Amino acid sequence: MDVYGLIGNPVGHSLSPPLHAAAYDECGLDARYVTFEPAPDDAAAAIRGAGALGVAGLNVTAPFKQSAASAVATDSMAARVGAVNTIDFSGAAPRGYNTDVAGVKRAFAHHDVSLSGAQAVVVGAGGAGRAAAFALADAGATVRIANRTRAAADELAADVGGTAVGLGDLPRSLADATVLVHATTVGMDDPDTSPVSADALHDDLAVLDAVYSPVETRLLRDAAAAGATTIDGAWMLLYQGAEAFERWTGLDAPVAAMRAALRARL
């Protein structure tokens, strides 16, 4: 039996176990997905321990994505993002990847949204915001970053060759935008809040909200009312998981089965 897993703290809320279990069942794999919850400063030791125990692959979630990038060798994209959310132990040494980047790209592709040449705005410069910004820039979009802390927006904009804008400038920045990614926790605890005023949204936008609980956020409701294409955060979660599965197994991910398992729990 192959063992895969997730490290984070906490991990009890994670939807990765049912997501991956559905993939293993659909593909007839003798595999199991488990969770590990090391102390906040023990990421490197936990990764080494997982490898020593014969774990085939790990997903990494908060607060360990950045420390994991320092604990293992990474591919070029994970190095640029500065965060690892997937580790493969199949080689001579563990190797880290950031499948959140692919999760963003594949979520837009699923909804027939082209990112090449897009005018994109990303709200948030944390882990999800960084992955989104790199995904958009790598796909050929022009990227503007808005964040509560301007220094973080400036840093991320410089990293992706984009532009930082103030949160107060969002309506003006969105006027000619074709893509909006929201990558903060706004709307998670209070589903009636939104990071963007409804009157700044329009029907030329494709809006991805990285929040997936609730699935339908205030931002997505307002965007739909404005005629925009809406993409909930469960699509990003689904496709980052599919990308990890494909890296570990070399098989095409059974996306439909994984999506059904995910939606059943949302």
Swiss-Prot record:
Catalytic reaction(s) noted: shikimate + NADP(+) = 3-dehydroshikimate + NADPH + H(+)
Main EC class the enzyme belongs to: oxidoreductase
Residues binding NADP(+), per UniProt: G124, A125, G126, G127, A128, A210, G233
Similarity annotation: Belongs to the shikimate dehydrogenase family.
Name of the protein this chain belongs to: Shikimate dehydrogenase (NADP(+))
Keyword Amino-acid biosynthesis found: yes
Binding site for shikimate: S14, L15, S16, T61, N85, D100, Y212
NCBIfam families: aroE (TIGR00507), PRK00258.3-3 (NF001319)
Species classification: Archaea, Methanobacteriati, Methanobacteriota, Stenosarchaea group, Halobacteria
GO molecular function: NADP binding; shikimate 3-dehydrogenase (NADP+) activity
GO biological processes: amino acid biosynthetic process; aromatic amino acid family biosynthetic process; chorismate biosynthetic process; shikimate metabolic process
Alphabetical list of PANTHER family matching this protein: BIFUNCTIONAL 3-DEHYDROQUINATE DEHYDRATASE_SHIKIMATE DEHYDROGENASE, CHLOROPLASTIC, SHIKIMATE DEHYDROGENASE
Annotated keywords: Amino-acid biosynthesis, Aromatic amino acid biosynthesis, NADP, Oxidoreductase
Cross-referenced Pfam families: SDH_C, Shikimate_DH, Shikimate_dh_N
Organism listed in the record: Halobacterium salinarum (strain ATCC 700922 / JCM 11081 / NRC-1) (Halobacterium halobium)
